[in-house]
Amino acid sequence: MYKRQADGSLSALYGYIGLNNSNNRLRESSATSYYLQDTMDFGRLNVTVGYRSEDYDQRHRRWSDRAGPNLTMVRTGEADNRDTFATNDHTTQSFGATYEVNENLTLVAGFHEGMTPMFGADPEEADNTELGIRYSDGAGDVEIFYFSSEYSNLAAECTLVSGAACNPDESAVFSGGSADVEGLEFNGSWVFDGDGVSYPVSIAYTSTDATFNNSSESDYFGVVAAGDDLPYIPSSTMSLVAGFVSDSGLSGNMRLIDVGSSCSIAACGTYNKIHAHTIVDLNLRKALTDAMDVYVILENVTDDEDIISRAPSEGARSQKPRTLKVGFSYKF
């Protein structure tokens, strides 16, 4: 590793800085889960119901000693900085149903309670609903779904990579209150056959509306007003892949990914914006034998440099630069 100093400040790459109170920690969890699930067949209608109960214990210990990378030396004694223990339990239910309209078309519905345990805080909880249709005719497959997640307790933990203006040494969990995420999703894939060549095409598109339901202020979420957008959730995403597969063993594809704009915090300012951006990748592959292929991949063909992230904290991250990869793969 190297250090470089310019204009009185350090930049570029830094060497090992040793352990401190934030990263010299040990977290342990144990959980016991019980679940029941039953699927009922009513001909064209299938209904599945489920129940899950989970008991879990959590322990978080932190040491203030800085002894370099040898963790064994600093974790032999009692955790002098923090030692907390918690016991929790939670239950969730789910429901799912499919109805076959005909051999090509299926209706789908589902409701699932969700839970994410958090260290030293109430778990994150959400009610998740999906409604959609699936169509398949042998030459292609199409899915269209509406989805909704209603968070009663949106939770986040402060870490070095979270991008929030909080102190990672505290390992605090912040609540964003209630929030709603809903949208529409479309997935389609088709294969068009030619003379010795097939042409697979797939597209995926998602439109999302994600907002806070209440106003709050915290070091993690910042100043939030009811109706503000949730950070890092773009209004839309789209992926398009088109390629070819020949009988001679030559294949390739083009992938286009388009991501809408978003923000790194709810109160979006000039330096919190995440740009809408597009990425184009090309891939070409040739089978030499049944087991060996050679390939060439060109990523970010247009070499765009849009800002796509502002995490870890205090830094804007751009797209991966144009990258060329040449190699081979072998199947054992």
Go through each PLM region and give its residues:
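Signature of Gram-negative outer-membrane beta-barrel scaffolds
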Residues: K3-L105, T116-G120
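Short sequence motifs at beta-strands and strand-loop junctions characteristic
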Residues: S22-A31, T39, D57, F85-T91, ...
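Transmembrane beta-strands of outer-membrane beta-barrel proteins
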Residues: F42, V47-V49, L107-A109, L131, ...
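Outer-membrane beta-barrel "beta-signal"
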Residues: G132, S318-F332
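Residue-level signature of outer-membrane beta-barrel architecture
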Residues: D38-F42, S53, D89, A97-E100, ...
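Outer-membrane beta-barrel pore domains and translocons
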Residues: D41, G50-Y56, H112-G114, F147-S149, ...
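Membrane-embedded beta-barrel scaffold of Gram-negative outer-membrane proteins
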Residues: E100-E103, L107-V108, P123-S216, I297-E299
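Gram-negative outer-membrane beta-barrel transporters
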Residues: R44, A172-A267, D290, T302-E305, ...
